[in-house]
């Protein structure tokens, strides 16, 4: 350590070479700073005698206070009376006496530990405290060790530990117990979760969570590992319960990615479950379909490559995995070129797709309108040339291309086995943007646009497997074909007419509205009524985005039919400020028997968090089924947090009712003592003395 610097009102050196400093004494050595009322230094013993109030700070958030002390010259060893150790300006450890050992350990005897604010004018004990015969703080290891520790709420003893070790608040990765949770569920009973975190090394960790209740014995787990060029995570659970007493139940979700050679990225996602109801019974997920996937891809400025395999599993009552496309293989290659001879941009694409159903029945045995065992393979290629011209204020874009495909169908006695196509495409897009600066500083943009498009060839007779559900929105308004996959294409002449108006003002409010309609020479038979694209005249599309300076953002999309009735509507919104964060959505879709949607779909979803004051926060999450006229799920939470404790209560009600799912209610309670690493709540400003919390 470097030389020490001493500052005081009065400094004297006695005849026996002792140094005595009095009045506002400050001593500095390295990062360590000491203040006291008086210091007497004996050079023969190398010891300092200090008179308080004494404060020692090491520059890392550790502060030691005392009434009297005797320390070594480097302040790394010594004895302190009436000591109080403060960690990170939050956790306080008060003791009759303390000793410092080698600048690393601070041993405190007959200790009281709390992070609650203690006021001289408030005679009540702190909300919580840990009393211990001895406490050792390892500053280097960032650990706190307790001997014969007793947890008290106010002055009432609650728990006792012969030995206890907890990390301090600066420690972010340390083996130990995390926040426990008391959980009550209408189906699983009342139970207790106690997570235990194991730091295997700086790059790997494992969390094991025993969950014990009246009706279940469950072990939850999570494993994470980071690599130089990737990461993996596995999470799941294994259960023996009274719901299915003869079965061992469980689930596994795994995912990860790795950067490999030549800019390729390998990604995987595995989703497995023992039975259809397990995820819902234990509130692990609300998914009703699982998709496990592995893919390798590369994205560059003018090139994209992807190869993937997907395995699908349904958890729905009305779906049978044997007649669903359970295995899907896809390969995609896209390339952009900019030929100087032609000008503009040349886009090339090739795609291969194959899916199969486990069933080998080559007809519709279950009567759902789809052949039970149908398998399909297709190969598609596409080449398109695009060029944009500017004629005054008019922007014109031309698109010329050709598309081809080969299709093979097996295990289907009702369809041809092979089919192919080679079709030309062409389009002309016109835009005329107009800009005006308003007197209020806002900028107004009006852009009418129109597209005339044509795709040759005839509609395929192969089954429509991938394009049964079509969305019509602003994103595909000017597409040549609005089917989601190449197994179907729009044919013949079509025209798209619309306009966009925008008001842009970052200091006030901004709004963008787009409206338009598609007109066709011939109706497309594979567009159903819910797509909004059936017939020779599509539904009218109206979409918009609104953003206010105060934090409100709205996005909406609506389709109107010829009678100006709404056939599909979607509205999403979010509003956030310092105290409030609210999000919600509304969706409505008319019935469409052609895609086995025999009822209207209507839903309202709301989630929000409101901070009542600096201590109280309330949250609500709800999903309401408009058609059924009932709530689908509802969840509410309440959090109380001050400088020393965080208490969270959560209640959730699921109204699902089917052969595998039953309505259930769950209640969860978590309690966290602030000041330790296992606390995950945000820091709350300590209350001021003189304002007692009731």
Predicted feature descriptions by range:
Residues 1-121:
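Charged (often Lys/Glu-rich) extended helix/loop segments that serve as interaction or gating elements
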Residues 62-79, 85-117, 123-130, 137-694:
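Outer-membrane beta-barrel proteins and related beta-barrel translocases across Gram-negative bacteria
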């Amino acid at each position: 350590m470097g030389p020490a610097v001493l500052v005081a009102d009065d400094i004297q050196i006695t005849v026996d070479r002792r140094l005595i400093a009095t009045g506002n004494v400050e001593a500095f050595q390295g990062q360590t700073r000491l203040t006291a009322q008086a210091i007497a230094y004996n050079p023969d013993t190398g010891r300092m005698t200090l008179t308080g109030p004494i404060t020692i700070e090491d520059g890392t958030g550790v502060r030691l206070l005392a009434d009297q002390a005797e320390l070594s010259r480097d302040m790394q060893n010594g004895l302190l009376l009436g000591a109080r150790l403060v960690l990170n300006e939050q956790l306080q450890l008060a003791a009759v006496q303390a000793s410092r050992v080698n600048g690393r350990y601070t041993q405190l005897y007959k200790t009281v530990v709390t992070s609650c604010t203690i006021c001289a004018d408030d005679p009540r004990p702190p909300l919580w405290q840990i009393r211990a015969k001895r406490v050792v703080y390892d500053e280097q290891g960032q650990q706190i060790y307790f001997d014969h520790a007793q947890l008290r709420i106010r002055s009432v003893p609650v728990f006792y530990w012969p030995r206890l070790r907890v990390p301090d608040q600066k420690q972010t990765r340390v083996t130990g117990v995390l926040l426990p949770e008391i959980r009550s569920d209408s189906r699983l009973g009342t139970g207790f979760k106690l997570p235990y975190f194991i730091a295997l090394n700086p790059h790997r960790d494992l969390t094991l969570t025993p969950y014990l209740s009246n009706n279940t014995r469950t072990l939850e787990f999570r494993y994470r590992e980071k690599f130089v060029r990737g990461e993996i995570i596995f999470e799941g659970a294994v259960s023996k319960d009274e719901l299915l007493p003869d079965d061992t139940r469980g689930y596994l979700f795994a995912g990860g990615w790795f950067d490999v050679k030549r800019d390729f990225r390998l990604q995987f996602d595995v989703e497995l479950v023992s039975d259809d109801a397990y995820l819902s019974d234990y509130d692990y997920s609300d998914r009703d379909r699982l998709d496990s996937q592995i893919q390798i891809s590369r994205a560059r400025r003018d090139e994209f490559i992807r190869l993937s395999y997907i395995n699908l599993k349904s958890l729905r009552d009305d779906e049978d995995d044997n007649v669903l496309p359970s295995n899907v293989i896809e390969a995609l290659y896209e390339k952009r070129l900019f030929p100087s001879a032609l000008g503009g941009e040349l886009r090339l694409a090739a795609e291969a797709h194959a899916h199969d159903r486990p069933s080998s029945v080559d007809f519709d045995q279950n009567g759902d309108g789809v052949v039970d065992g149908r398998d399909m393979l297709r190969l598609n290629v596409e080449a398109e040339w695009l060029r944009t011209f500017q004629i005054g204020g008019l922007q014109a874009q031309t698109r010329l291309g050709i598309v081809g495909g080969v299709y093979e169908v097996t295990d289907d006695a009702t369809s041809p086995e092979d089919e192919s196509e080679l079709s030309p495409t062409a389009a002309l897009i016109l835009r005329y943007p107009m800009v005006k600066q308003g007197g209020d500083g806002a900028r107004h943009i009006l852009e009418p646009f129109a597209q005339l498009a044509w795709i040759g060839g005839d509609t395929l007779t192969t089954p429509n497997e991938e394009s049964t559900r079509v969305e019509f929105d602003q994103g595909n308004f000017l597409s040549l074909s609005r089917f989601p996959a190449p197994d179907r294409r729009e044919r013949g002449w079509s025209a798209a007419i619309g306009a966009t108006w925008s008001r842009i003002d970052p200091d006030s409010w901004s709004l963008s509205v787009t409206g338009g309609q598609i007109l066709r020479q011939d109706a497309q038979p594979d567009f159903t009524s819910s797509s909004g694209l059936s017939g020779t005249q599509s539904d009218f599309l109206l979409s918009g985005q609104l953003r206010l300076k105060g934090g409100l953002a709205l996005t909406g999309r609506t389709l109107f039919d010829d009678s100006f009735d709404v056939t599909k509507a979607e509205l999403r919104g979010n509003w956030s400020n310092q105290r409030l964060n609210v999000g919600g959505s509304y969706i409505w879709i008319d019935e469409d028997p052609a895609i086995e949607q025999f009822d209207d779909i209507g839903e309202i979803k709301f989630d929000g968090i409101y901070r009542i004051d600096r201590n109280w926060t309330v949250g609500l999450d709800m999903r309401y089924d408009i058609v059924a006229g009932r709530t689908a799920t509802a969840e509410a939470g309440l959090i109380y947090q001050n400088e020393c404790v965080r208490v969270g209560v959560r209640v959730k009600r699921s109204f699902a009712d089917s052969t595998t799912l039953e309505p259930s209610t769950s209640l969860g309670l978590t309690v966290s003592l602030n000041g330790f690493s296992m606390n995950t709540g945000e820091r709350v400003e300590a209350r001021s003395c003189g304002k007692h919390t009731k």
